[in-house]
Amino acid sequence: MEDGDWVLVENLMNSIPMVDSETSKPLKVTFNGPAKSWTDAIPIGNGRLGAMVWGGVSSEIIQLNEDTLWTGTPSDYTNPDSPEALSQVRNLVDNGKYTEATEAAVNLFGNTTEVFQLLGDIKLQFDDSHLAYSEETYHRELDLDTATARLRYSVGDVEYTREHFASNPDQVIVIKISGSKLGSVSFTVSLDSKLDHHCYINGGSQIIMEGSCPGKRIPPKVKEGDNPKGIQFSAVLDLQISDGIGIIRVLDNMTLEVEGSDWALLLLLASSSFESPFTKPSASKKDPTSESLRALKSTANLSYSDLYARHLDDYQNLFQRVSFQLQKSSNKVRENEPLVINNLMPFANAVNLKGNKDDVVPTVQRIKSFQFDEDPSLVELLFQFGRYLLISCSRPGTQVANLQGIWNNELDPKWDCAPTLNINLEMNYWPALPCNLSECQEPLVDFIKSLSVNGSKTAQVNYQASGWVAHHRSDIWAKSSASEGNAKWALWPMGGAWLCTHLWEHYNYTMDRDFLENEAYPLLEGCTSFVLDWLIEGPRGYLETNPSTSPEHSFIAPDGKIASVSYSSTMDMAIIREVFYAIISASEVLSKSEDTLIQKARAAEPRLRPTQLAQDGSIMEWGLFHISQPPPKRSSDCRRLDRPATTLESHVREAQVPGRKGA
């Protein structure tokens, strides 16, 4: 076999789930107390529905999300004044007036994105005896192998357990509450939300919550009727208890009370009126409450064991495709390193040195001790936790994983919880293919398709270009134009191009020719068409991007001022090379190498401005030798790391793939 030859290997996507029973160990994230903040709660999800389990004892909050709950409505992502503004910015860049170009770039901005919303909370209240629970008996865990959040504690001689999972087959969040003594389970349950909503009891054992998202990200201070109609939603909570033992009472038409049961089962279903990125909520024909009740009806003949078995069959088919083990003895505390034990003394009461410490040591303490014991099993856990999160927030037919996956507890979350295209969205899906979760990437492909629809209008009107374009941030409505804000992140028309590299990668892993021909290639064609029109010839004959930014980064211009707009950032050039490589390679597979577009891409690729190296040999972010980077605002400014990384990512891939040209 010659270097660079292709080798046909078995399609791992169809592999049978296997776990090495001899060396595998429980993959669990463990806690020894209730969550004190939202980020300490346990995330569960089925791709569409998400929940955060706090693990409170006398009172509990299970925070809920549904992936289509966003503010806003479909919008127009074009600006007929942009071509004139683009010409002005380009002239300023050509004349070396980078500060002025940065200021003038504001005329290329569009509106900001809409905002991902929360669904609400399940609120559980137990009687006062639970205030006296035994802290030593408390245990909360996320079992990655079963995608189940569990809670266990004792009150006197009664042990209470709660189990939580989000079923994809039945589209329901399931919670089971049990006590070790007959008739020991008593509590009240209600639903609540920060969104406009109302609740009522249905049939004596169900709570229905109906509400709506704002029609605009910041609701105007006008009469409610003047506010555009936003996405409507409904959540249905069904309550079941043990046969013949215990009763359910209705309190104030919004709360249910359970008294003296052996166990209780809560089923949470939710739906919204969202139909597509191109359908106004006011035009939706979906009835969220009817849909939720219909989904509940489909579970009528399923016991808890049935629901759990169906959940496991679905989830483990994905999760157990990959096992990851760094060393066979990773489940034991190192016995011959006194320094390790000495530094673990603060945790000594929680560590059973003769057994498997992962069953008793809270994960946060394992993280703290990692600097001393370098426990490889913690790395294994982190790896699988990443796979768990992707499975939980991105499934076929769901929305794309946003900035926080699917979990959010605020009406005004950081960065709108929006899909951020300048690295965050790509990072969400980097594990999908290498970690054998190709199905979980399907929402990303669907999202790219929606972006291409709106992006073709933005490209044509704003930039007088063919094909389609997307910028640094989007939302459920597939926003494709630049956002309001700072040019260093808003003015970046490479978002769609970078996403398209995932399409070629998907084919490389799956060898799905039908996908390549009917889904990936048309999107790559549109992306390549835009890139070719966006490139302009520079003074030295290179094809350049102008204006150009290196996302979220600035430089000190020759006039001594901070600027961010210039030409041909290394990131732009790296992404464009990736796109050209992808479509040229795809055309060879599909026998389209002679197409006009492919010939244009082949001709343009060697004319792209080459990567610039600084005097110390480092890769420069911009093609300008006479500028410098401002120091970070704070020494711990880790966000600076994501910008150079995006540039380097392409060069690393070029070095790894036979036949690829280096920049």
Residue ranges: model-predicted function:
Residues 6-487, 505-507, 525-528, 542-543, ...:
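Aromatic-residue-lined binding/catalytic grooves and analogous aromatic/hydrophobic interfacial grooves
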Residues 526-586:
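Acidic/histidine-rich catalytic neighborhood
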Residues 373-380, 422, 497, 514, ...:
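Soluble non-cytosolic domains of exported or imported proteins
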Residues 147, 495-502, 527, 575, ...:
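Amphipathic, well-ordered alpha-helical segments in soluble domains
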